[in-house]
């Protein structure tokens, strides 16, 4: 999980979601693309 000031989708499988007030990116194809804003 990468923590970044700005999260962007890295590939076509990345989805931007909101969990507990935090913006996150989850990726079904590549788990390395997981990101959290903060």
From Swiss-Prot:
Gene Ontology biological process terms, A to Z: translation
GO cellular component, as recorded: cytoplasm; ribonucleoprotein complex; ribosome
Pfam families: Ribosomal_L36
Stated name of the protein: Large ribosomal subunit protein bL36
Family listed: Belongs to the bacterial ribosomal protein bL36 family.
Family annotation (SUPFAM superfamilies): Ribosomal protein L36
InterPro entries: Ribosomal_bL36, Ribosomal_bL36_sp
GO molecular function annotations of the record: structural constituent of ribosome
Gene: rpmJ
UniProt keyword list: Ribonucleoprotein, Ribosomal protein
